A protein has these predicted regions:
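Short amphipathic alpha-helical interaction segments
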Residues: 49-57, 134-152
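A short, conserved structural fragment
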Residues: 62-70, 147, 151-164
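Short alpha-helical segments that sit at the start of domains
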Residues: 10-15, 81-118
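DNA transaction DNA-binding modules
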Residues: 52-53, 68-71, 107-111, 121, ...
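Short acidic, hydrophobic short linear motifs in intrinsically disordered regions
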Residues: 34-44, 111-130
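Eukaryotic partner-binding/assembly regions in large regulatory complexes
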Residues: 1-82
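Short, cationic-aromatic polyanion-contact patches
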Residues: 80-83, 161-172
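Short acidic, glycine/proline-enriched loop segments that cap or flank alpha-helices
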Residues: 108-116, 134-138, 159-160
């Protein structure tokens, strides 16, 4: 296993190291991510590196009791194992994540031809209010932190400027 890694050029070794660190940090890699500049989904470099060296990475993680899996239909590579501890999400991030899942499922059920949806912060906060999980509207700082956290984990991509968050801010 080490021989395989040592035979790679230094750039590839560095790419594999970055992929391993990303998987340990967020436990998954997405095949495609929304590129705001181009206005469309783009393939991610990390996913391609992981796919190219999948067998090596599978053995690498197996040595630590961690399973590396790929879901081709969802465009996802992820790790699983009892020794993994994910980051604890703040309450608002958890609420937004669950509401986003509901909105996504509803739009997919309405025979959407796209695998991503566009919604607004107003729609998310409105749904959270309907379910009674938000008693008051969160502060702009708390919303900004939550959106930044979900963006970091590649759950959402704001279409509008992050500093100008309001109810009409669009999210993919």
């Amino acid at each position: 296993m080490i021989d395989y890694f040592e035979q790679l050029i230094p750039e590839e070794q560095e790419e594999i190291t970055e992929v391993i660190q990303t998987l340990f940090r967020q436990t998954f890699l997405l095949e495609r991510k929304f590129d705001r500049r181009l206005g469309r989904m783009q393939y991610t470099h990390e996913y391609r590196v992981c796919s190219k060296h999948f067998e090596f990475l599978k053995l690498y993680f197996a040595a630590a009791g961690i399973t590396l899996n790929e879901n081709v239909q969802m465009g996802l590579i992820y790790i699983q194992g009892e020794t993994l501890w994910g980051e604890k999400l703040p309450r608002l991030a958890t609420i937004y994540l669950l509401i986003l899942k509901l909105i996504y499922d509803e739009q997919m059920a309405s025979v959407s031809s796209s695998n991503h949806i566009v919604t607004t912060l107003g729609a998310i906060n409105g749904r959270a209010g309907e379910f009674g999980v938000l008693r008051t509207l969160p502060s702009p700082t708390e919303i900004r932190r939550t959106v930044a956290l979900l963006k970091r984990y590649q759950v959402i991509e704001p279409l509008d400027v992050l500093e100008e968050l309001n109810e009409s801010t669009r999210l993919v």
